[in-house]
Amino acid sequence: MLDPNLLRNEPDAVAEKLARRGFKLDVDKLRALEERRKVLQVNTENLQAERNSRSKSIGQAKARGEDIEPLRREVNKLGEELDAAKAELEALLAEIRDIALTIPNLPADEVPVGKDENDNVEVSRWGTPREFDFEIRDHVTLGEMHSGLDFAAAVKLTGSRFVVMRGQIARMHRALSQFMLDLHTEQHGYSENYVPYLVNHDTLYGTGQLPKFAGDLFHTRPLEEEADSSNYALIPTAEVPLTNLVRDEIIDEDQLPIKMTAHTPCFRSEAGSYGRDTRGLIRMHQFDKVEMVQIVRPEDSMAALEEMTGHAEKVLQLLGLPYRKIILCTGDMGFGACKTYDLEVWVPAQNTYREISSCSNIWDFQARRMQARCRSKSDKKTRLVHTLNGSGLAVGRTLVAVMENYQQADGRIEVPEVLRPYMNGLEYIG
């Protein structure tokens, strides 16, 4: 959520920055609501002061032996007016907050302006796509050859966009997640976490999934039902529970950065993706991901974004997978991001690069929703932290890339060297 003071005092400047990412801020409506808020605020404060003054007069009149009943009736009437004014003010503040919750983050100045993914800017490439001297098989064909990917069984169990993995393919999928976790915890300084896969609505508001993206989630009960202890949603990413671990916390600045990682399944309805990537593992309702989250001082967040992106890149480099790094344009960034790098891995059967990691600096956008703050050791003042998140990596898409890039002419799949210790020294699948 954006700083309310910024929205009140500099709405035109905010609107100009939001326009860069294709969001139209209704400045006139905000101004009208703000003027109404000021009027109601003053009215409420005046009624409160008047009621306090008249209440005090009751005691004084009583001490003088005067009839206090007229004063008591007046105080009661003022109390009713005050309650009505407070209710009106609270309703208006709720309306303003509801609007604020739908406004995306401001883009950083260095983010390229653009409309969609076609305007993203390539930053660098690593590795050279392999030239095959045989007909390339896609991961679905390879998986079926080795009885490792069974989409028909998943349709029977659940429906489309799910998969059953078996045998050495399932083992490689597990090996990838273990390798990623070990790399991030042993070399990159992250602490491993095991988190719930079901979270409450407060948690989803904290990281920005609610209210705007309710339709992208799997809910245990209809969202319109009153929230209670049994009203949950499945996590779309481990970013949600990991980041919310600091909700309503005040952290000493010398404890920062906090670097966390977790391997979880992720659940997404893919509501806007009908007809896209219907074959294979690229776009699933349920997929595994190793997530990275950092909680940092505000002045450190841009450097932390570069570091985190480098950690995701290291996974691809050690696996020997060609990839490219791009910076997302303003129109393609996620709702809460101020700056995002995507890593796209080479997928031979599609003859193109596909997203495998997204690393974002969220600034104080989530921290303000969560009231996550840090305290200076010198003056004890508190301020909002900055939060960052990144995929390190999406496990299913990494499996796709390994299967296709390491395939052999006879259909076998070479196991990358860094994965062999996790697969009992196995060199080839098949």
UniProtKB/Swiss-Prot annotation:
Predominant localisation class: cytoplasm
An example Gene Ontology biological process: seryl-tRNA aminoacylation
One MF term in the entry's GO annotations: ATP binding
PROSITE patterns for this protein: AA_TRNA_LIGASE_II
Enzyme class, spelled out: ligase
Subcellular location: Cytoplasm
Binding residues annotated for L-serine, in chain numbering: T237, A238, E239, E291, S391
Pfam family, one: Seryl_tRNA_N
GO cellular component, one term: cytoplasm
Reactions catalysed, as given in the entry: tRNA(Ser) + L-serine + ATP = L-seryl-tRNA(Ser) + AMP + diphosphate + H(+); tRNA(Sec) + L-serine + ATP = L-seryl-tRNA(Sec) + AMP + diphosphate + H(+)
Recorded metabolic or biological pathway in which this protein acts: Aminoacyl-tRNA biosynthesis; selenocysteinyl-tRNA(Sec) biosynthesis; L-seryl-tRNA(Sec) from L-serine and tRNA(Sec): step 1/1
InterPro entries: aa-tRNA-synt_IIb (IPR002314), aa-tRNA-synth_II (IPR006195), aa-tRNA-synth_II/BPL/LPL (IPR045864), Ser-tRNA-ligase_type_1 (IPR002317), Ser-tRNA-synth_1_N (IPR015866), SerRS_1_N_sf (IPR042103), SerRS_core (IPR033729), tRNA-bd_arm (IPR010978)
Biological function: Catalyzes the attachment of serine to tRNA(Ser). Is also able to aminoacylate tRNA(Sec) with serine, to form the misacylated tRNA L-seryl-tRNA(Sec), which will be further converted into selenocysteinyl-tRNA(Sec).
Protein's name according to its UniProt entry: Serine--tRNA ligase
Native species: Salmonella arizonae (strain ATCC BAA-731 / CDC346-86 / RSK2980)
